[in-house]
C-alpha cells in the first residue's frame, strides 16, 4: 500500500472498514473512471492520455486473459 498516494490509502481504509461501499465489479469501476477522465476536455491532454492508455491496457489484458 505504501506505493499509493495518501488519498488512495484513505479510501482503501474506508472500504476495508465498511465506512465506504465496496464495488464488486472493480475492473468495470476502474474502466468507467478512466474513460471519464480520458473524455474530460477540462483536464490536461497528458492526464487524459495517461487515463486512455491505462484503460486500453486493461481492456487488452482482460480480453487476452479470457
From Swiss-Prot:
InterPro entries: UPF0253. Pfam families: UPF0253. It comes from the Bacteria. Belongs to the UPF0253 family. NCBIfam families: PRK04964.1. This is UPF0253 protein YaeP. It comes from Salmonella typhimurium (strain LT2 / SGSC1412 / ATCC 700720).
Amino acid at each position: 500500500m505504501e506505493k499509493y498516494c495518501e488519498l488512495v490509502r484513505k479510501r482503501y481504509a474506508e472500504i476495508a472498514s465498511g465506512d465506504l461501499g465496496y464495488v464488486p465489479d472493480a475492473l468495470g469501476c476502474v474502466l468507467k473512471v478512466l474513460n471519464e477522465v480520458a473524455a474530460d476536455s477540462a483536464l490536461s491532454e497528458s492526464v487524459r492520455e495517461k487515463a486512455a492508455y491505462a484503460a486500453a491496457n486493461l481492456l487488452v489484458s482482460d480480453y487476452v486473459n479470457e
